[in-house]
Swiss-Prot record:
InterPro entries (UniProt xref): GlcNAc_MurG (IPR006009), Glyco_trans_28_C (IPR007235), GlycoTrans_28_N (IPR004276)
Pathway(s) this gene product operates in, as recorded in its UniProt entry: Cell wall biogenesis; peptidoglycan biosynthesis
Membrane topology, from the record: Peripheral membrane protein
Organism, scientific name: Magnetococcus marinus (strain ATCC BAA-1437 / JCM 17883 / MC-1)
Gene Ontology terms for molecular function: UDP-N-acetyl-D-glucosamine:N-acetylmuramoyl-L-alanyl-D-glutamyl-meso-2,6-diaminopimelyl-D-alanyl-D-alanine-diphosphoundecaprenol 4-beta-N-acetylglucosaminlytransferase activity; undecaprenyldiphospho-muramoylpentapeptide beta-N-acetylglucosaminyltransferase activity
Record's keyword terms, sorted: Cell cycle, Cell division, Cell inner membrane, Cell membrane, Cell shape, Cell wall biogenesis/degradation, Glycosyltransferase, Membrane, Peptidoglycan synthesis, Transferase
Family: Belongs to the glycosyltransferase 28 family. MurG subfamily.
Source organism phylogeny: Bacteria, Pseudomonadati, Pseudomonadota, Alphaproteobacteria, Magnetococcales
Protein name: UDP-N-acetylglucosamine--N-acetylmuramyl-(pentapeptide) pyrophosphoryl-undecaprenol N-acetylglucosamine transferase
A single cellular component GO annotation: plasma membrane
Main location: membrane
């Protein structure tokens, strides 16, 4: 551990896509600079309220809302609340007195970054997706460095100092052993499928995945499933798999994602930036179904990073039918080497040192002046 005091403030959150990379960086910074060297500013309703304290970090929250998709009155109220949120954030920033700030996106990042800029604190902004959002494109003008996760994204920040770092993943995920696909799936060594749909699950997976897998099991295909599902559907889906002869675990939240990835031969998931980074880090082949309502269709762009190098497969939601999935998994069972190859290619895309690269860059910014 470095004994030189260095305090990092991380601003933003809301979803796992913003938080998990932030936590990966926070863990590395804490290793280098000590227990109380990281502080978070987030929103009052986001996942940060559970994940940040559980990871052992301090968190303060701002009353800031969402601008998109909730009607003009809501947007006007949100805009009206931004100035008070900036003043609230300014007090939080002054109390923690950080040496450097990292913005990670989410609604709380804007007032916190504006406050930090007003205090002359060096800042970096991390863009997780292959298509930068409007908020981050605007906030990039407050930051001295923009850090991106995908090739080509720096072009979306013209005139800004920009570096490709990759998207940090938690250390436990980076340590998942390489994929080892058998030459033949058997009852003793079945095809193991991991299904998840983000922090709220994905109802289309709850419907279509069992519709595809149960006929395969009836024809003797050896399959195991671990599936994240909305809490209201977990018990019914568990019974459905059990009655169809498939060994399955259905759960609203997968606590140990590293073990879940380690045990998976195939992943079926959305293609948020964190999921794509985790698929690469763990070297797991995947069928990615982009969330169709993601801003600027950024999930499809994220998935394309792996699809373009044959490190996974993408299927649009309107084309993700159970008959197609049944046929596709049948082909994978007949040719397991396809899974091995896709997993190895996916792992070649990983940037396992993204967290350390970001920490080193942030540390170098401490003495920078605007």
């Amino acid at each position: 551990m470095n004994n030189t005091p260095r305090r990092l403030l991380i601003a933003g959150g809301g979803t796992g896509g913003h938080l998990f990379p932030a936590l990966a960086v926070a863990e590395r910074w804490r290793e280098r600079y000590g227990l109380h060297s990281v502080h978070f500013i987030g929103g009052q309703r986001g996942l940060e309220n559970r994940l940040v304290p559980n990871a052992g970090f301090t968190l303060e929250t701002l009353a800031v809302g969402q601008l998109k998709g909730k009607g003009l009155p809501h947007k006007l109220r949100t805009l009206g609340g931004l100035l008070p949120a900036v003043w609230q954030a300014r007090g939080m920033v002054q109390r923690f007195d950080p040496h450097v700030v990292l913005g990670v996106g989410g609604y709380a990042s804007a007032p916190a970054m504006v406050a930090a800029r007003s205090l002359g604190i060096p800042m970096a902004l991390h863009e997780q997706n292959a298509r930068a959002g409007l908020t981050n494109r605007l906030l990039s003008h407050l930051a001295q460095q923009v850090l991106v996760s995908f090739n080509g994204v720096c072009a979306q920040f013209p005139g800004r100092a920009c570096q490709l770092t990759g998207n940090p993943v938690r250390q436990a995920l980076a340590a998942v052993p390489p994929l080892q696909i058998p030459t033949l799936f058997t009852p003793q060594r079945p095809l193991r499928i991991l299904v998840f749909g983000g922090s709220q699950g994905a109802s289309i997976f709850t419907q279509r995945v069992p519709e595809a897998l149960l006929p395969l099991a009836q024809h003797g295909a050896p399959i195991q499933v671990t599936q994240q599902v909305q809490e209201a559907d977990a018990d019914a889906l568990q019974r459905r798999y059990q009655e169809g002869g498939i060994e399955a675990i259905t759960t609203p939240f997968i606590e140990d994602m590293a073990t879940a990835y380690a045990q998976a031969d195939l992943v079926i998931c959305r293609s948020g930036a964190t999921s794509v980074a985790e698929l690469a880090a763990t070297g797991r082949p995947s069928i990615m179904v982009p969330y169709p309502y993601a801003a600027d269709d950024h999930q499809a762009a994220n998935a394309q990073a792996l699809v373009s190098i044959q490190g996974g497969w993408m299927r649009r939601q309107e084309q993700f039918h159970s008959a197609w999935l049944e046929a596709f998994i049948t082909s994978l069972c007949m040719q397991p080497a396809q899974l091995q190859r896709a997993g190895e290619i996916a792992r070649s895309y990983a940037r396992p040192n993204a967290d350390m690269q970001i920490v080193t860059l942030l540390a170098s910014m401490v003495k920078m002046k605007r």
